[in-house]
């Protein structure tokens, strides 16, 4: 079987990660004690991707839970699904990272690293054919960002031929937890560019917009935000967990979605998103799902896809629906919005269908977009970073842990280069591509003649 080992790091990573396990356990008919109570063979057909079948038909998540302070772990252990996880796979420190990336990456996190890697190795050794890892973390704090990226770098070194996917919660100015978020996020994105194969960017600002505008929640809790993220993660992983043809493993998804290795930051979206009160007044149709799914208001990252162009898109429809109708609707969207899809990647929208809908829904659709508009998120972080770094504000907290100013400048430059690359491919046309190729050929011919 093609197994995936899941690693959740830091407070945010653990809260979202544990919600993800609740949602997919429910979808696969697994109760909080790990017993199967489902009603369909499809639930068990690929259960081994995320679960290990232990003694006495108990299904245990292939999950490693990491934090530098114990409070989140205590609440997970004390929660309804606390006994689902393997106790040995819960690793926590005592002191925390205090929202400091350097503590997570170089000092406190580094001290705990070998213990975590041992647990991950044990999980990986228990797999028949490991396809890769998924990391759930946030970029704004200290543990998820600093230790999360340290772990990612080590996994990339130790398992270079395996895919690493991250679900990364990006900080936003409207929902700020701490003043040093731009530093932590820039240092993290620098690492993700180099060490992640594919990253799903989830943005607190977008989640708040959805809760306010669409779901009509006046004071959204983190529970509501995490629920949105878990819906999206459940949708994104549908192809990996249930039998299907398209994007059925992490590598196939990467091959279809990533035309250039550094441009691997995806914008996820989900439909239907309707407020609880209005649900019973609407019968969902494939056209409506498709229209909602491509709508900026349904995106989990606060950037407008109409300000950029799609390099590639993958969509996952769930529920009983006609494949022909889905294909027609997707084609329709592409025709109507052809300016927002690069013309030099033909057939750049992939569609998968899974018969099993999420709990409580007849049908749903998940969107994964590789769009140049994602640069808006990085630009926002970069501007905030520059404002503080130009005054060297708060730097002493980082240099005190052994970092140097040069590390910050290097990270900022790498993010700036990424922005330029996105802009370059946003502006590229099919004619320009051919001209570039001809120029290269002419230069090669000239050098041959010499």
UniProtKB/Swiss-Prot annotation:
InterPro entries for the chain: Beta-tubulin_BS, Beta_tubulin, Tub_FtsZ_C, Tubulin, Tubulin/FtsZ-like_C, Tubulin/FtsZ_2-layer-sand-dom, Tubulin/FtsZ_GTPase_sf, Tubulin_C
Comp. bias (Acidic residues): 430-450
Binding residues annotated for Mg(2+), in chain numbering: 69
Keyword presence, Transcription regulation: no
Residues that coordinate or bind GTP: 69, 138, 142-144, 204, 226
Main location (coarse class): cytoplasm
GO biological process per UniProt: microtubule-based process
KW Secreted (keyword) present: no
Subcellular location: Cytoplasm, Cytoskeleton
Disulfide bonds: none
Keywords: Cytoplasm, Cytoskeleton, GTP-binding, Magnesium, Metal-binding, Microtubule, Nucleotide-binding
Cofactor: Mg(2+)
Lineage: superkingdom: Eukaryota
Assembly and oligomerization: Dimer of alpha and beta chains. A typical microtubule is a hollow water-filled tube with an outer diameter of 25 nm and an inner diameter of 15 nM. Alpha-beta heterodimers associate head-to-tail to form protofilaments running lengthwise along the microtubule wall with the beta-tubulin subunit facing the microtubule plus end conferring a structural polarity. Microtubules usually have 13 protofilaments but different protofilament numbers can be found in some organisms and specialized cells.
Family from the record: Belongs to the tubulin family.
Role summary: Tubulin is the major constituent of microtubules, a cylinder consisting of laterally associated linear protofilaments composed of alpha- and beta-tubulin heterodimers. Microtubules grow by the addition of GTP-tubulin dimers to the microtubule end, where a stabilizing cap forms. Below the cap, tubulin dimers are in GDP-bound state, owing to GTPase activity of alpha-tubulin.
PANTHER family: TUBULIN
Protein name from the UniProt record: Tubulin beta chain
Organism: Bombyx mori
């Amino acid at each position: 079987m093609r197994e995936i080992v899941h690693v959740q790091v830091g407070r945010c990573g653990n809260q979202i990660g544990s919600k993800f396990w609740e949602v997919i356990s429910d979808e696969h008919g697994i109760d909080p004690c790990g017993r199967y109570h489902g009603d369909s063979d499809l639930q068990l057909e690929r259960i081994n991707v995320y679960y290990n079948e232990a003694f006495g038909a108990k299904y245990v998540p292939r999950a490693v839970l990491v934090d530098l302070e114990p409070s989140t772990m205590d609440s997970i252990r004390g929660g309804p699904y606390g006994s689902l996880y393997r106790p040995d796979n819960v690793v926590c420190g005592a002191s925390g990272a205090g929202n400091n990336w350097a503590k997570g990456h170089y000092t406190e996190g580094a001290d705990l690293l070998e213990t975590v890697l041992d647990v991950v190795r044990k999980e990986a050794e228990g797999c028949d054919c490991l396809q890769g890892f998924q990391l759930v973390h946030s970029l704004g704090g200290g543990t998820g960002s600093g230790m999360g990226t340290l772990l990612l770098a080590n996994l990339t070194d130790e398992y270079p031929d395996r895919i690493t996917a991250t679900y990364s919660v990006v900080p936003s100015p409207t929902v700020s937890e701490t003043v040093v978020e731009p530093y932590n996020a820039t240092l993290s994105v620098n690492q993700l560019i180099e060490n992640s194969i594919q990253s799903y960017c989830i943005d607190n600002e977008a989640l708040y917009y959805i809760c306010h505008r669409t779901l009509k929640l006046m004071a959204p809790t983190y529970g509501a935000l995490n629920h949105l993220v878990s819906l999206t993660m459940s949708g994104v992983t549908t192809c990996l967990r249930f039998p299907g043809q398209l994007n059925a493993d992490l590598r196939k998804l990467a091959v279809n979605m990533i035309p250039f290795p550094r441009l691997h930051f995806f914008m996820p979206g989900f439909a239907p998103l309707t407020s609880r009160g209005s649900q019973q007044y609407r019968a969902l149709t494939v056209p409506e799902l498709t229209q909602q799914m491509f709508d900026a208001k349904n995106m989990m990252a606060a950037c407008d896809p109409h300000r950029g162009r799609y390099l590639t898109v993958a969509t996952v429809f769930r529920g009983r629906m006609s494949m022909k109708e889905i294909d027609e609707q997707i084609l329709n969207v592409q025709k109507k919005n052809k300016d927002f899809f690069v013309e030099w990647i033909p057939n750049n929208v992939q569609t998968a269908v899974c018969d099993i809908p999420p709990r409580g829904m007849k049908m749903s659709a998940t969107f994964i977009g590789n769009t140049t508009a994602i640069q808006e998120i990085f630009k926002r972080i970069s501007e905030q970073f520059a404002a503080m770094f130009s005054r060297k504000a708060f730097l002493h907290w980082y240099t005190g842990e052994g970092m140097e100013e040069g590390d910050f400048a290097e990270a900022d430059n790498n993010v700036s280069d990424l922005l330029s690359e996105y802009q370059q491919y946003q502006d590229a046309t099919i004619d320009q591509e051919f001209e570039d190729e001809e120029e290269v050929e002419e230069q090669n011919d000239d050098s041959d003649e010499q």
